[in-house]
C-alpha cells in the first residue's frame, strides 16, 4: 500500500516539474520578444530621426535613375551581343564562303593545268590580291530599300593604264573586250596600222593580268602576259573570256567588208584561241561549214564571254541563209519592247509589220540578222564540242553585238541596240545541257544609245534600221531574292551622234547623278563596264573601258575609266565630272 502511494507521489512530482519548466520557457520567450520589440522600436525611432519625408519622396527618383543606368548598360551589352552575332553568324561564314570559292577556283585552274601539262598549257596560275577575294563576279550591292539612283559614280580616279595606245597619227586601236574571273582578267583589242576603216589587215592585242593594290591602297591592273597577234590572219570582232586555262578568245577571220560578207553564200571563218598562263598562244579554226551551216555571215559579239559549267559561252550574231532551216523556223516571229511611259502612237498592225521587217534590214541584202550563243568545252584541246544555240525572235530583237555576263549565280546576255529599241537590254539566261535559254529582258529606259533617225535615242516605235553603238551595262544592285535592280554603265548621252560619254547608275526608269568624261561634244564609241569590290575596305568600284576620240595619236584611244560607287540619299541626278 505504501509502495503504491509512493509511486503516485513520484509521478505527481515529475508532472509538476515539467509544468515548472514550461512556465520558465514561456517567460523566457516572452522576455526575448519584448526585448526584440523594444530594439525594433528604438531602431525605427532612430531611423525616423535620420530620415525626413523629403528623403522618402526622392527614393522613387533614385530608383528610376538606377533603373535607367541598368537598362542603358544592358542595351550597350545587347549592341555588343548583336555585333558578335553578326560577325559570328553572318559575316565570318560569308567571308569563309568567299575564300572557299576563290580557293576552289584556283584549285580548278591548277587542276586544268596539271592535266594539260604535257600539252604545254602553262604553269603558275595567277590570282588577284587577297583584298579582292569574294569581291569579283558577286552581287556587289544587295539592297531592298534604297533608291537605286542614290548610288552614283565618283569622279574618275587616276590609276595605272594597262591598255596600249596608238603611237602614230594613222594608228587605230578599237573594239575592246574584257572579262574578269575570281582569279584573273583578260583583255583584247584590235590594232589597225592605217586607219580604223581598213578591213584588209590588222593584228590583235591580247593580255592576261590580275588586280593588285598598292601600299597606299590604290587599285591597279597588273598585266602578267600579253601578245600581239601580228600575222597573216585578219581577226575581227573578237570576244575574250577568263577561263581556268587562261584567256579564251573567239574571233572571225575576214578579208572583205561587212556588207560583202553578208552577200556571200558561205559562213565566215571563225577561230577559238587561247593565251595560256605561260604566255603562249594557240588557236584552232572552227568547222563553220557544219556549225554555221545555215549562215552567210557570223561574228562574235565583241563583248566578253563567260565560263559556265566547264564551258566558255560567247554571244554571236550574223545573217541567216534565206529559206534555210534556221531561217524558216524564225519566219513570222517578232517581239516589240516598249519605252517606259512613252507609248508608240502607231496602229498595232503597223507596229507588228515594222517589227517583223526590223529583222531583215536592207543594208545587208534583206538577210535575217540573228542573235545566237556559242558554247565551247574548255579543255586543253581548242574548239572542242562547240554547240550553237539560236534563241527565238519572240524573245530577242534583231541580232547584234553582245556580251555574256555572270554575276553571282545569275547569267545575262547584253544585246547592243542596233535595231529600233534604244534602252539597254539584259536578257536573263539559263544554261542546261550545253545550250542556253533567254528570257524576257530587263530594260533600262534612261540608259540609251545614239542612233540614226528613225531609231534615235528617243525612238519609241518599231522600225527597220542598223544603228546604235555597243555600251554594255553591268549588273550592280540586287534584291535579296537575287532579282536585278540596277546597273552601272557608260552611255553616249546624245540623240544621234556618238558624243558625250557619261557614267551613271541606272534603274529601270531613271539614272543617278552622272560623271562625264569631258564636255558634251567629246567624241566616243564602244564602252564595256565591269564592277568589283575591295572586300578589305568594302568599297565598290566600276571600270568602264571606253573608246575616246584622240586627235593626235590615232582616231580613238581606249581608256580604262575607274570610278568608286558612292551613295547619296535623296539625289536623283546631278551633273558632275
Curated annotation (Swiss-Prot):
Tell me a Gene Ontology molecular-function term this record carries.
Answer: host cell surface receptor binding
Kindly indicate whether the keyword Membrane belongs to this entry: yes
- Per the record, ranges on the Virion surface side are 49-577
Membrane topology is: Single-pass type II membrane protein
Spell out which residues lie on the membrane's Intravirion side.
1-26
Q: Where is this region: Important for interaction with fusion/F protein?
A: 124-152
A Pfam family assignment: HN
Q: Which residues carry this modification: Blocked amino end (Met)?
A: 1
Instruction: Enumerate the UniProt keywords alphabetically.
Output: Disulfide bond, Glycoprotein, Hemagglutinin, Host cell membrane, Host membrane, Host-virus interaction, Hydrolase, Membrane, Signal-anchor, Transmembrane, Transmembrane helix, Viral attachment to host cell, Viral envelope protein, Virion, Virus entry into host cell
EC numbers for this chain = 3.2.1.18
Task: Give me any GO biological process, just one.
Answer: symbiont entry into host cell
User: What pairs make up the disulfide bonds?
Assistant: 172-196, 186-247, 238-251, 344-461, 455-465, 531-542
The places in or outside the cell where this protein is found are:
Virion membrane; Host cell membrane
Glycosylation sites recorded in the entry for this protein: 119, 341, 433, 481, 538
Q: What class of enzyme is it?
A: hydrolase
Q: Give the reactions, separated by semicolons, that this protein catalyses.
A: Hydrolysis of alpha-(2->3)-, alpha-(2->6)-, alpha-(2->8)- glycosidic linkages of terminal sialic acid residues in oligosaccharides, glycoproteins, glycolipids, colominic acid and synthetic substrates
Q: Where are the transmembrane segments?
A: 27-48
Q: Name one GO cellular component term.
A: host cell plasma membrane
Q: What is known of its domains?
A: The C-terminus (head domain) is involved in binding the cellular receptor.
Q: Which family does it belong to?
A: Belongs to the paramyxoviruses hemagglutinin-neuraminidase family.
Q: How does it assemble?
A: Homotetramer; composed of disulfide-linked homodimers. Interacts with F protein trimer. Interacts with host CG-1B; this interaction inhibits viral adsorption and replication rather than internalization.
Q: What is this protein called?
A: Hemagglutinin-neuraminidase
What organism is the protein native to? Newcastle disease virus (strain Beaudette C/45)
Amino acid at each position: 500500500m505504501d509502495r503504491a502511494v509512493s509511486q503516485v507521489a513520484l509521478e505527481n512530482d515529475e508532472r509538476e516539474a515539467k509544468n515548472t519548466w514550461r512556465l520558465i520557457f514561456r517567460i523566457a520567450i516572452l522576455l526575448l520578444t519584448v526585448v526584440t520589440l523594444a530594439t525594433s522600436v528604438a531602431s525605427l525611432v532612430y531611423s525616423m530621426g535620420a530620415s525626413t519625408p523629403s528623403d522618402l519622396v526622392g527614393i522613387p527618383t533614385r530608383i528610376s535613375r538606377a533603373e535607367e543606368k541598368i537598362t542603358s548598360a544592358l542595351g550597350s551589352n545587347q549592341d555588343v551581343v548583336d555585333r558578335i552575332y553578326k560577325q559570328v553568324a553572318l559575316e565570318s561564314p560569308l567571308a569563309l564562303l568567299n575564300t572557299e570559292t576563290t580557293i576552289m577556283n584556283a584549285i580548278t585552274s591548277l587542276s586544268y593545268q596539271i592535266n594539260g601539262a604535257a600539252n604545254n598549257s602553262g604553269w603558275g596560275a595567277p590570282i588577284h590580291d587577297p583584298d579582292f577575294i569574294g569581291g569579283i563576279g558577286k552581287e556587289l550591292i544587295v539592297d531592298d530599300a534604297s533608291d537605286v539612283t542614290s548610288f552614283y559614280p565618283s569622279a574618275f580616279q587616276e590609276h595605272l593604264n594597262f591598255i596600249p595606245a596608238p603611237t602614230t597619227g594613222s594608228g587605230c586601236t578599237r573594239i575592246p573586250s574584257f572579262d574578269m574571273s575570281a582569279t584573273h582578267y583578260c583583255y583584247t583589242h584590235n590594232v589597225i596600222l592605217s586607219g580604223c576603216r581598213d578591213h584588209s589587215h590588222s593584228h590583235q592585242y591580247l593580255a592576261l593580268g590580275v588586280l593588285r593594290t598598292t601600299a597606299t591602297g590604290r587599285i591597279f591592273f597588273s598585266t602578267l602576259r600579253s601578245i600581239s597577234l601580228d600575222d597573216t590572219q585578219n581577226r575581227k570582232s573578237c570576244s575574250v573570256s577568263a577561263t581556268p586555262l587562261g584567256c579564251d578568245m573567239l574571233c572571225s577571220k575576214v578579208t572583205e567588208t561587212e556588207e560583202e560578207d553578208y552577200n556571200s553564200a558561205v559562213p565566215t571563218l571563225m577561230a577559238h584561241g587561247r593565251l595560256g598562263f605561260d604566255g603562249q598562244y594557240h588557236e584552232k579554226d572552227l568547222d563553220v561549214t557544219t556549225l554555221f551551216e545555215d549562215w552567210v555571215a557570223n561574228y562574235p559579239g565583241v563583248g566578253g564571254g563567260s565560263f559556265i559549267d566547264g564551258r566558255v559561252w560567247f554571244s554571236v550574231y550574223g545573217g541567216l541563209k534565206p529559206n534555210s532551216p534556221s531561217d524558216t523556223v524564225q519566219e513570222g516571229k517578232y517581239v516589240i519592247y516598249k519605252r517606259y511611259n512613252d507609248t508608240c502612237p502607231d496602229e498595232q498592225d503597223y507596229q507588228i509589220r515594222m517589227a517583223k521587217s526590223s529583222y531583215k534590214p536592207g543594208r545587208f541584202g534583206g538577210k535575217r540578222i540573228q542573235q545566237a550563243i556559242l558554247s565551247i568545252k574548255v579543255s586543253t584541246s581548242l574548239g572542242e564540242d562547240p554547240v550553237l544555240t539560236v534563241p527565238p525572235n519572240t524573245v530577242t530583237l534583231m541580232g547584234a553585238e553582245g556580251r555574256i555576263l555572270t554575276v553571282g549565280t545569275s547569267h545575262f546576255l547584253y544585246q547592243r541596240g542596233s535595231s529600233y529599241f534604244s534602252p539597254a537590254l539584259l536578257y536573263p539566261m539559263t544554261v542546261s545541257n550545253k545550250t542556253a535559254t533567254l528570257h524576257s529582258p530587263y530594260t533600262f529606259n534612261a540608259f540609251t544609245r545614239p542612233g540614226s533617225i528613225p531609231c534615235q535615242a528617243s525612238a519609241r516605235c518599231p522600225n527597220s534600221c542598223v544603228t546604235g553603238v555597243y555600251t554594255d551595262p553591268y549588273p550592280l544592285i540586287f534584291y535579296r531574292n537575287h532579282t536585278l535592280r540596277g546597273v552601272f554603265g557608260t552611255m553616249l548621252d546624245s540623240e544621234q551622234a556618238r558624243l558625250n560619254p557619261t557614267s551613271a547608275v541606272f534603274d529601270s526608269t531613271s539614272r543617278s547623278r552622272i560623271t562625264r568624261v569631258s564636255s558634251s561634244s567629246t567624241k566616243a564609241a564602244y564602252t564595256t563596264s565591269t564592277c568589283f569590290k575591295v572586300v578589305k575596305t568594302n568599297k565598290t568600284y566600276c571600270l568602264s573601258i571606253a573608246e575616246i576620240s584622240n586627235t593626235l595619236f590615232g582616231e580613238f584611244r581606249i581608256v580604262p575609266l575607274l570610278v568608286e560607287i558612292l551613295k547619296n540619299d535623296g539625289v536623283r541626278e546631278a551633273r558632275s565630272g
